[in-house]
Amino acid sequence: MTGTPAQVGRHGPTRRRVLTTALAAGAAALGAGALSGCGSALAADDGSTVRLWDPFSGADGGLLNEMVAKAQPDMPGTRVERTVLEWGTPFYTKLAMASSGGRGPDVAVSHMSRLAGYAPTGLLDPWDTDLLAEYGIARDDFADAVWSRTQFDGQTYAVPLDTHPFIVFYHPGPAKKAGLLTADGTLDADAFSSPDRFLAAGKELAKASGKQGIAFGYVTDTAQCWRLFYGLYRQTGGRFELREGGPAEVDVDRMAEVISFMAKVVDGTVNPKHLDYASAIASFVNKQTAMTLSGEWELGTYRAADKNVGAAPFPTVFGTPAVYADSHSFVLPHRDHPDEEHRRRTHRAVAALLKAGQVWATAGHIPAYQPVTRTTAYARLEPQAHYAQAASHVVLDPSVWFAGAGSDFQNAMSQVLQQALLGDMTPDRAARAMVRRLNTFLSKPSPA
């Protein structure tokens, strides 16, 4: 997720809670870098306030407050005022409505996967990359896999804050006993480098733990099956081109191959079969399983249960490195006549927040601003540093208006995949059902 059940379907129930009106309307001030709620994005002030809308409550919200405080020396005379909104459809609906009427905040946090539904419609304004460069933020500071998704018609419509990939967590004890760790104590990726090896590793983990091997929570979830499927499918090198009007250009045989593998991972023998999101978390926290397939946004939960919990990028099972992910990014809601000096202030504030990314990294998110991940301080973060390389191989949702975090598209794909994983549909039938649903989405006109 972030979006991290917080962000993220990611972003799920363990990290995002419905916010009360009071929380959305007000928060504590942080001195010169004040954090507060606001009733109106355009309320009068002396021009020193940069208003930010974001979906971060709970632990992530606290970390963003810390980032604002840490960033203050790099944005003197500026205060950041946050308004926290419920993540998901309510957040994006309110952002779209406010932007269309020119009443949005100065800056907002959006999932990168939703950009294709916003940038082409005129709801967002592009960033001034020359201005960002004045404050030390350059295109080369970001991984190609992430930065490439910020572009539309040759302009930059998002500035990435993080990458939040779908990875693997493991308990070091049974992983070591199963012979699945390297000499330096990290996960042996080669042991998971094909479907057969992955399944064999799951059996070894089950033997070593005396319980079960790998947990994956997906039942009734609106995104989990899609995350696992799309990352694996992109590892096959198969086409997934979605042109407006359709039909979808995909490799049905490779789709079926991936679905077949997914079903074997949760076949109910060495790995649990019918786990929902919360049950998968519980099975790993309680050490009923030795490994879990999960978003990095659950690091806090897992580390609270096992301070030595290990993590690694999702293994390359089908030949080509690819890790499903999304990215929290800063976007500029459209203004018909933006104040140039205030836009400069907004650019400076975002640059300052990016440079304070070490704070954000403590939650498990990979800072998108790579000068942060190259520091000695970041290298000391474990297990974060062990999966940071995932940022170089991330794949986001297809760049189409109907896809992205919290979308009906993810839910529709996940519902079909769930039927296959529960044994109610063959992999081939599931693949073809997904294609039919893809074509239905493609037949709908883009709002742009």
Locations of the language-model features?
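Conserved N-terminal structural module of periplasmic/extracytoplasmic solute-binding proteins
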Residues: 2-117, 133, 139, 318, ...
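Extracytoplasmic/periplasmic substrate-recognition and gating elements
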Residues: 73-74, 79, 264, 270, ...
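Long, aromatic- and glycine/proline-rich binding clefts that accommodate carbohydrate-like moieties
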Residues: 307, 312, 362-415, 419, ...
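Paired acidic/hydrophobic, glycine-rich loop segments that form the ligand-binding mouth/hinge
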Residues: 106-109, 290-295
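Hinge/lid segment of periplasmic solute-binding proteins
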Residues: 112-167, 225, 392
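Glycine-centered hinge/linker elements that transmit conformational signals in sensory
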Residues: 197-204, 243-274
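Extracytoplasmic/periplasmic solute-binding protein
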Residues: 153-161, 166, 193-247
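Ligand-binding "clamshell"
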Residues: 118-126, 153-155, 302-318
